[in-house]
Regions:
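Bacterial N-terminal signal peptides
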Residues: 8-18
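Positively charged n-region of N-terminal signal peptides that target proteins for export
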Residues: 1-4
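Short S/T/G/P-rich N-terminal loop/turn motif that feeds into the first structured element of a domain
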Residues: 19-239
């Protein structure tokens, strides 16, 4: 009887553990349209310590077998120069509810990153394939044109319709996202990954259509530089 009981424990307990852990792991890798884009500002005189701590934090993600890809950029041109932007793309809603070991992630983040930065923004976005040219996750190129557009209230539908009408004319990778939480609404973000500054400056084909000018309250255009050592899970272009 004792041996039979041990056999039952050996069969049933692993099955229970699998049932408890498998759904979360499956949800974490489930693809979808949602992205998280966040930004932080290194404290005065602590940029070196921040970058070293952030790299250590990414090592935690690797050890935890995180399946998400994390992009890291420094803002090169814009009023937020030298701030840091990090993002992850292509998640389902269930996936966003199932990050890898969130309590341990937060503990490591507080230890390695938080002492050296001010957290200044964190928002969720939905990718809009009907307005875009690309997959919803930007190519990890050396440069990224990052455009933020705040609309006048009640103009989102007209704005999207105008962009949808011009979608077939897009020539380079152009990714549009609608903010769903985390800032002024309605807000849209356009990402244009490019290999260098020349590709951004010499490309005049991606201007917004004239018919949306009166819908826009504010437009901010920044140029970001990819930080490969401060990114995780990316296959770099040209590598």
């Amino acid at each position: 009887m004792k041996h039979r009981w041990l056999w039952m424990v050996g069969v049933v307990l692993p099955a229970i553990l699998v049932a408890q852990t498998a759904p979360g792991a499956e949800a974490q890798s489930e693809r979808g349209p949602f992205a998280r884009i966040a930004s932080l500002r290194p404290l005065e005189g602590q940029t070196v310590d921040f970058e070293a701590g952030y790299i250590r934090h990414l090592a935690w993600h690797q050890q935890a077998k995180d399946t998400w890809a994390w992009y890291g950029w420094s803002i090169w041109a814009g009023e937020r120069q030298r701030w840091f932007v990090y993002a992850t793309f292509g998640h389902s809603a269930a996936g966003l509810d199932s990050p890898v070991a969130p309590a341990d992630d937060e503990r490591d983040n507080v230890l390695n990153v938080a002492p050296h930065v001010e957290y200044v923004g964190n928002a969720l976005y939905e990718y809009l394939p009907g307005l875009s040219r690309g997959t919803g996750a930007p190519q990890p190129t050396a440069k990224l044109e990052f455009t933020t557009i705040d609309l006048a209230p009640g103009t989102a539908k007209a704005f999207e319709e105008a962009l949808r009408a011009g979608q077939s004319k897009l020539e380079g990778e152009t990714l549009w996202y609608r903010m769903v939480a985390g800032g002024t609404f309605p807000r849209y973000v356009r990402l244009r990954p490019r290999p260098n500054l020349s590709a951004i400056l010499n490309d005049g084909s991606e201007t917004l259509p004239d018919e949306v000018d009166h819908l826009i309250a504010k437009t901010t255009i920044e140029i970001l530089s990819l930080r490969p050592t401060m990114s995780f899970g990316l296959t770099l272009v040209g590598k």
